[in-house]
């Protein structure tokens, strides 16, 4: 799996092992971002059930201002952390290890708003 376009183009990222996570295929991600291209630059992204973080990292690579990645699976969270460091996106990505409902409640209380949600 790799980042398709933007500042991190071509960088290979890892996916959690096992059957608990099914990463979004490169070609699917490419098509989604081709459709959303005008909305990505400067956007604030929320990636629920983020797995490897591929959707959020792709968005940030293509110019999104920031991303919040949420996953309840500890293995997935560890892979996201490693991918985030590898991509040097620590300053633009926040990773939350928690249930999506708890994360959404926490983000609402903090008045966080998002332009794109995956």
Predicted region positions:
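Class I S-adenosyl-L-methionine-dependent methyltransferase catalytic core
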Residues: 1-118
């Amino acid at each position: 799996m790799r980042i398709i376009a933007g500042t991190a183009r071509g960088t290979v990222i890892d996916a959690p092992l096992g059957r608990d996570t099914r990463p979004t295929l490169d070609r699917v991600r490419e098509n989604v971002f081709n459709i959303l291209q005008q909305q990505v630059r400067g956007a604030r992204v929320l990636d629920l059930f983020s797995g490897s973080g591929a959707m959020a990292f792709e968005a940030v690579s293509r110019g999104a201002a920031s991303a919040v990645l949420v996953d309840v699976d500890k293995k997935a969270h560890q892979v996201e952390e490693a991918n985030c460091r590898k991509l040097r996106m620590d300053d633009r990505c926040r990773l939350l290890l928690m249930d999506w409902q708890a994360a959404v409640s926490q983000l609402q209380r903090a008045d966080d708003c998002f332009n794109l949600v995956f």
